[in-house]
Amino acid sequence: MTSQLPLGLRWPRRQRFEHFHAGANAAALAAVQMLATQPGAPWVYLSGGAGSGKSHLLMAACQAAHEAGHTVQYLPLRSLRDHFMAVRGVAGSQFIALDDVDALAGEREAEHALFDLYNRARAEGTALVFTAQSAPAQLALGLPDLRSRLGACTQFALKPLEDSERREVLKRQAALRGIELDEHVLDWLFARYARDLGALLDLLDRLDQASLAAQRRVTVPFLRSFLREAASPHE
């Protein structure tokens, strides 16, 4: 139930370090970059809510570690709710990314499995990076030793980009696609659509295809029509 990178395949193209818009999270970016490429670097624990960029950094780290020649495993723990014990079988990789470790909270056997993995990785020199909604001290863990181990990592509470930063990112990414987003379009979009950067960039990809197919500029009427046809829940 873990994900390894098969030969010839790639991690998500957009979720690379160079596409991470750090804002106030420059120190976290630097720490994760170091962990992914330099053996012996401090382990990292990233916390933050939806849209904070923690999964982006995790995927970017996996990709960078793979490109540096390391064997990589990625565990999306929230997606493994019925298979938490897969954690116990994780072994043999040089870089392991554990996404949403808070999903294990309250699962006694899974907490012990993660505790054992932590200790094995430390003994074997494996690099670990963790993400969760909250800092280790705030997790509802039943195993105090696990909380202590996670708390020993270098911790970063990721801060979401401000609206002004999201607008600039969206304009810049649109320009790379040959799309002009004027302030009127951005005002309309930000008033009616999710402000999560990942969702906005996904929308931009779809707008790029739709505007090319229709041979039209992205205007408010075009955007309104596009969202209506897509049956967006945000419209």
Predicted regions and their residues:
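Conserved nucleotide-sensing/catalytic segment adjacent to the nucleotide-binding pocket
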Residues: 86-131
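Short regulatory helix/loop adjacent to the ATP-binding pocket of P-loop NTPases
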Residues: 136-151
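A short, basic N-terminal segment
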Residues: 1-34, 39, 212-235
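C-terminal helical "lid" of AAA+/P-loop NTPase domains
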Residues: 187-191, 198-212
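AAA+/P-loop NTPase substrate/partner-engagement loops
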Residues: 67-95
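Walker A/P-loop nucleotide-binding motif
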Residues: 40-58
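Conserved AAA+ ATPase "sensor/coupling" helix adjacent to the nucleotide-binding pocket
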Residues: 153, 167-180
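Conserved AAA+ ATPase "SRH/arginine-finger" region at the nucleotide-binding site
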Residues: 153-165
